[in-house]
Every structure is written in C-alpha cells, then in structure tokens.
Amino acid sequence: MAKDDVIEIDGNVVEALPNATFKVELDNKHVILCHIAGKMRMHYIKIMPGDRVKVELTPYSLDKGRITYRYK
C-alpha cells in the first residue's frame, strides 16, 4: 500500500543511531535521518553502516525518511 506522493531515492548508510535510526547520505550528498520500515523490522532485515539502501521521503519533510529496501 504505497503512497503516490513519496520521493524514492538511493543512498548509503553512514551511521547507526539508537532506536533503529540511521544517518543516510543520499546520492545528492545530503545527509538525512531515516528509520526502518515496518515490513523490514518484521522480517528482521539488518542494516549496517556502508549498506546501499532505498529511502522514501515525503514532500512535506525532506530531512527525515524511511528505509524501504536494502540492496544486496
């Protein structure tokens, strides 16, 4: 059930923070805070610094995002 108005962009995880929050450097060199999507938590997908991830941003808040996919 994805929303139509989200912005999807790729990035690299820079730092792991408490409470499943991560600093992610996007391809355009901006660094944002991201949390893990619920489906990724449910399936115990681990995110480590250095991983390449797909991030969803809303047009309302471009400094926070949600990690929806970890590339292999």
Swiss-Prot record:
InterPro entries: NA-bd_OB-fold (IPR012340), RNA-binding_domain_S1_IF1 (IPR006196), TIF_IF1 (IPR004368)
GO cellular component: cytosol
Domain of life the protein comes from: Bacteria
Major place of residence: cytoplasm
An example molecular function term from Gene Ontology annotations: ribosome binding
Keyword Nucleotide-binding: no
Pfam annotation, one family: eIF-1a
Localization annotation: Cytoplasm
Domain S1-like residue range list: 1-72
Cross-referenced CDD domains: S1_IF1
Chain ranges passing through the membrane: none
DNA-binding as UniProt keyword: no
Keywords, in A-Z order: Cytoplasm, Initiation factor, Protein biosynthesis, RNA-binding, rRNA-binding
Main function: One of the essential components for the initiation of protein synthesis. Stabilizes the binding of IF-2 and IF-3 on the 30S subunit to which N-formylmethionyl-tRNA(fMet) subsequently binds. Helps modulate mRNA selection, yielding the 30S pre-initiation complex (PIC). Upon addition of the 50S ribosomal subunit IF-1, IF-2 and IF-3 are released leaving the mature 70S translation initiation complex.
Family: Belongs to the IF-1 family.
Matches recorded under NCBIfam families: infA (TIGR00008)
Subunit structure, interactors included: Component of the 30S ribosomal translation pre-initiation complex which assembles on the 30S ribosome in the order IF-2 and IF-3, IF-1 and N-formylmethionyl-tRNA(fMet); mRNA recruitment can occur at any time during PIC assembly.
PANTHER family in UniProt: TRANSLATION INITIATION FACTOR IF-1, CHLOROPLASTIC (PTHR33370:SF1)
Name of this chain's protein: Translation initiation factor IF-1
